[in-house]
Amino acid sequence: MGSATGHAMTSHESRSGNRGILHLFAAATGWFAVAAWGAEPQVTEGFVNAPVAEVWRIFTTSEGFLATGAAQAEVRLAIGGEIRSHYNPQGKLGDAETIVNEILAYEPERMLTIRIKQAPASFPHRDAVAGTWTVLYFNPAGENMTHVRIVGLGYNDSPASQAMRKFFAEGNRWTLDHIAKPYWPKCKLCEKESG
């Protein structure tokens, strides 16, 4: 095999050259992966003192979804199905303030993947929604306890995307805490202090 300088490459030079090309390719591929993925995922985790089946029901049924803090909800669990929710009790499902999440994938009682199909008209980060999606993982964590991991993906480094990421970091934390609260254990001291 010849080189650009016209001299024959030794076997060692050939291997080194190939390694250099591989390193360059790996670096370029790594850069592309970072550019394609953008910012780090937004991750929120928590535990709910309830079996996985119960926590799954909360996220995947119309009645259960009310436990997330929604005033109204309609869930159709299917690929391409929707989770429609409204957080204003005076609002109406289907109006401009309805949140519509499309179900992209699911594995019963293990994983649910959604994307925002329609953000509320008043949502300040509407322009940053495109290209984002969320994966929710449900894992047993001992007897009658579920570990929930919410991973928001598709964010980029733009100010609008980062503002939306912060919004969902706070909102997802609130939602998980809200879901978990009714299941918190009530020890005798806790009951005495709260009563």
Residue locations for each model-derived region?
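Beta-strand/loop substructures that line and gate deep hydrophobic ligand-binding cavities in soluble
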Residues: 122-170
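Bacterial N-terminal signal peptides that target proteins for export
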Residues: 10-25
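Bacterial N-terminal signal peptides
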Residues: 23-35
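Amphipathic alpha-helical segments
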Residues: 49-68
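Short, highly charged C-terminal tails/helix-capping segments
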Residues: 153, 181-195
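A short, structured loop/turn motif at beta-sheet edges
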Residues: 49-53, 77, 104-112, 137-147
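Hydrophobic/aromatic beta-strand elements that line small-molecule binding cavities or substrate pockets
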Residues: 44-46, 72, 98-105, 131-140
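Short beta-edge strand/loop motif at the mouth of beta-sheet-based domains
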Residues: 63-98
